[in-house]
Every structure is written in structure tokens, then in C-alpha cells.
């Protein structure tokens, strides 16, 4: 893979690691279809049903089947724990035949590493990672440059829930992310998939040019207990994308295991270049 130059402009005292993909990058573009289909992109933002390894093994086949049925082009997985090299998000990627990038600030020598994951079934040409300030457990943000038909699209993944979750800290992290996007997007259409503790009004104000895909942010966005703010969502650049639809990602009940809301999936259409420059 070819990391972006800005991914390397970090303080030398920080150990930001991007895991080796679980699979080789997909080499073939999506199956040919109508032109409108090639310009559509489906992006899921979710959390796994449990970060406990034993409980995860109880439900991972069910989650795998759910994502196999949904077939999102890109999956952002929040709050992933990698234990002794075992990564649940990359396990899913290996079964789905997606690539998997684990974005973390923890060094490889750490037994348990905290981060977020980016899964894609589209070809990935570049990726990068940066650290949002103030630093925290999940404050590493990542990006992938994907090939969608004849177009390149940037997908940024971040968890904007600083520790402590205060307005000044949220503003600082969001400002860091937007500055990084401005430095690395190279004018290409861009999305942000992640988890946001800011209110919807604050989120829209702090990410100019982007719009949340979720029409009803008051609804619970994930299974995580007590999460506040806007929650899991996909933000898209209004000058480059149009929202087609969004849907909740629901894990059905399975015997004694309850049904869970894992996140959301947005279906977006890439606008014509001529239309976006008028």
C-alpha cells in the first residue's frame, strides 16, 4: 500500500500503527452493471455486539451472515480490541473477502490494542493514519482512498468521543480531523464514517461541507450502553454526494441472545463532476 505523505507527519514520540491487511487488496473492480450502480456507494458504521472475546464468538457467525446479506462496500467498525493478534473486525474481513486496516495508537508489543477498523471490498490505492488531540484510547483516525468505477473516493474513519467528553476537547479533535482531511483529500469526494458524541447541530457546524446521512439522529444508533450525542453515522460532502437512503443495521435475536442495533448503513450516489462545479 502507498501511505499518504501526511500520514507520516506525526510526532516522533508517538507510535501509530496501521495493521497489515487481513487479505490482499481486492484487485478487480465491482462487477459491471448500470452506470448508476457504479456511482453508488454503501457505507456501514457500526460497533460489534460485544468486546468480550467469549461473547463475540457466540455471535460472530450471525454478524457475518448479516453483513453478507447487506453487502456494504465499506464497513467502519468502532471500538475494536485486538488481543494477542486476534482482531474480530479483521476476522470478519477475512470471511467477507474484504481488506482490513486496523487503526490504532497502541504499539504492536501491547497485548491488547485499542482502535477502529476500516473494511473494504473496493480496491484501496492509498491509506493513512493520524492522531487526534487530545489523545485518548480510540483517538487515532484513518483514511482509505477507494476506486469507485472511474472515480477515487476518500473514506475517513474516526471516533470523535474524546476523554473527557467536553466541548473544547470535541472541538479540538474535530478541528484536527478537518485539517487532516483538507491536507490529504486532494479535491476528491470524501466521507467520514464514525461515532460522534457532539449533538447534531454541533456536528454539522464543526464539519462544514458535510451532512449526516441519518435523517433521525434522535433514534439510538448503536447497541453501546448510554452513548450520547449524534452517535454512529456517515457524513458526506454535499457537493460530491447525494443521499439515497439510510437504514439501521439490526442484529436479530438468537435464542436467549437479544436483538441489537449495531449501527447504520448509508447508500450514497456520487454526483456528476460537472454538476458539482457549477
Predicted segments, located by residue:
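N-terminal, active-site-proximal structural segment of metallo-dependent hydrolase catalytic domains
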Residues: 2, 8, 14, 23-94, ...
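Metal-dependent phosphoester-hydrolase catalytic domains
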Residues: 16, 25-33, 182-191, 197-278
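N-terminal signal peptide c-region/cleavage motif recognized by signal peptidases
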Residues: 19-21
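Active-site-proximal beta-strand elements of phosphoester/diester hydrolases
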Residues: 38-52, 128, 152-162
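Active-site beta-strand/loop signature of hydrolases that rely on acidic residues for catalysis
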Residues: 42-48, 63-86, 119, 144, ...
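Short, flexible loop segments at the rims of nucleotide/cofactor-binding pockets, characterized by
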Residues: 50-55, 133, 166-170
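Active-site environment of divalent metal-dependent phosphoester hydrolases
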Residues: 53, 82-86, 109-111, 163-165, ...
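Structured beta-strand-rich core segments of catalytic domains in phosphoester-bond hydrolases
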Residues: 56, 79-160, 247-251
Amino acid at each position: 500500500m502507498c501511505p499518504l505523505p501526511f500520514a507520516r507527519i506525526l510526532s516522533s514520540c508517538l507510535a501509530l500503527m496501521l495493521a497489515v491487511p487481513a487479505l490482499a487488496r481486492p484487485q478487480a473492480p465491482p462487477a459491471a452493471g448500470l452506470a448508476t450502480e457504479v456511482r453508488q456507494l454503501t457505507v456501514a458504521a457500526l460497533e460489534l455486539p460485544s468486546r468480550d472475546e467469549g461473547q463475540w464468538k457466540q455471535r460472530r457467525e450471525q454478524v457475518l451472515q448479516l453483513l453478507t446479506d447487506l453487502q456494504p462496500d465499506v464497513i467502519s467498525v468502532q471500538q475494536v480490541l485486538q488481543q494477542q493478534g486476534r482482531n474480530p473486525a479483521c476476522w470478519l474481513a477475512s470471511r467477507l473477502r474484504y481488506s482490513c486496516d486496523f487503526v490504532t495508537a497502541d504499539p504492536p508489543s501491547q497485548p491488547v490494542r485499542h482502535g477502529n477498523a476500516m473494511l473494504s471490498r473496493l480496491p484501496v490505492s492509498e491509506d493513512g493514519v493520524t492522531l487526534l488531540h487530545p489523545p485518548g484510547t480510540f483517538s487515532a483516525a484513518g483514511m482509505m482512498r477507494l476506486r469507485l468505477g472511474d472515480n477515487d473516493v476518500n473514506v475517513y474513519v474516526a471516533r470523535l468521543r474524546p476523554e473527557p467528553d467536553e466541548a473544547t476537547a470535541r472541538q479540538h479533535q474535530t478541528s484536527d480531523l478537518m485539517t487532516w482531511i483538507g491536507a490529504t483529500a486532494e479535491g476528491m469526494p470524501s466521507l467520514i464514517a464514525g461515532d460522534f458524541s457532539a449533538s447534531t447541530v454541533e456536528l454539522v457546524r464543526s464539519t462544514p461541507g458535510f451532512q449526516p446521512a441519518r435523517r433521525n439522529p434522535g433514534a439510538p444508533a448503536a447497541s453501546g450502553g448510554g452513548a450520547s450525542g449524534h452517535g454512529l453515522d456517515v457524513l458526506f460532502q454535499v457537493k460530491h454526494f447525494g443521499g439515497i437512503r439510510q437504514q439501521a443495521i439490526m442484529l436479530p435475536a438468537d435464542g436467549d441472545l437479544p436483538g441489537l442495533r449495531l449501527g447504520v448503513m448509508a447508500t450514497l450516489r456520487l454526483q456528476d463532476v460537472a454538476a458539482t462545479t457549477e
